[in-house]
Amino acid sequence: MKLLNSVQNEAILSNVGEVGEFRIRNSAKAFSILSSGLYSNKIRAIIRELSCNAVDSHIAAGNASTPYDIHLPNTLEPWFSIRDYGLGLTHDQVINLYTTYFESTKTDSNEFIGALGLGSKSPFSYIDNFTVTAIKDGRKGIYTAFINEHGIPSIALMMEEETTDPNGVEVRFAVDQRYDFDKFRSEARFVYEYFSLRPVVSEIGRAHV
């Protein structure tokens, strides 16, 4: 989503002393607020934010009518995942996007939903680590995003290989709390009620849109 430039206010100052600019300190507290504190309903936010990213990637790739895939957690397969078939990401793009808050590739067009560069980090509101699989032009990179010992979000390349899989990105994380299985299901129903293009949802070997 294209962000409007804020109005430039000209302050008229006279007889002032030293002027200091406001800054944000690179700290675990700041990252916790940006990753988790923004969301009151964390499961709903994760589904919404990652799905918006998937839709935007499909639009950018010219695949706006192609559904993306999600997997809802259950007893036999206790994880959540979302896999798009959009542009995919190179190694440098993964490192840049996932380690820079407010970094977005979508600030110059109104065709896209997102723009703030926060949604890709939303899984940190629920869990301390998740997996990102990025496929781009025959290269597959598998990464682990995690909170390090200092409380700072980090990402590491775990494996890299050639592939014939279509471009796209998959985000996956474990859901250890069984009582959250039903909540993921109900929140997905709520979120996708407002999406014109529904994903393909898989659950215990069954798939539906």
Where do the protein language model's features map onto the residues?
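Bergerat-fold GHKL ATPase/HATPase_c domain
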Residues: 1-65, 92-99
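Short N-terminal helix-initiation segments at or just after the protein's N-terminus
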Residues: 10-21, 71-75, 111-119
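Conserved phosphate-chemistry cores used by DNA topoisomerases
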Residues: 34-52, 69, 74, 80-83, ...
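Conserved, well-folded catalytic cores of nucleic-acid-processing
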Residues: 37, 54-57, 100-105, 129, ...
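Short amphipathic alpha-helical segments
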Residues: 42, 46, 86, 90-94, ...
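Conserved beta-strand-loop-beta-strand hairpin that lines the nucleotide-binding pocket
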Residues: 55-109, 148-151
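GHKL-type ATPase core
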Residues: 109-206
